[in-house]
Amino acid sequence: MKRFALAVVTLVVCAGAQAASEEVEMNLVTSQGVGQSIGTVKITETDKGLEFAPDLKALPPGEHGFHVHAKGSCQPAMKEGKPSAAEAAGGHLDPHNSGKHEGPEGMGHLGDLPVLVVNND
């Protein structure tokens, strides 16, 4: 999976009980802070769980990690003595404290979502 130092997309879901859907703005982030908007992700409650519908622009073609993080901040924070992009978002959402990070294809914690694939067009 390709990694992008200048563009890390993180997602935090804070949906109210009465809300059937929520639209969340997505921004590019760097170790200096939150940057330009690149679109939205619409999150809808369905009978099978949450559905994530990204409407994003300006991402390079290829695979991108797609995650739900534990905290509602995409600000930089210190990691190993250096500013790190979106570190304030915390780890991936793991409300059951499974401690399992098995990636998008595994049966890990709830914060791991399928890989987001961006086509050339």
What are these regions (language model features)?
Residues 4, 9, 18-121:
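N-terminal leader/targeting pre-sequences
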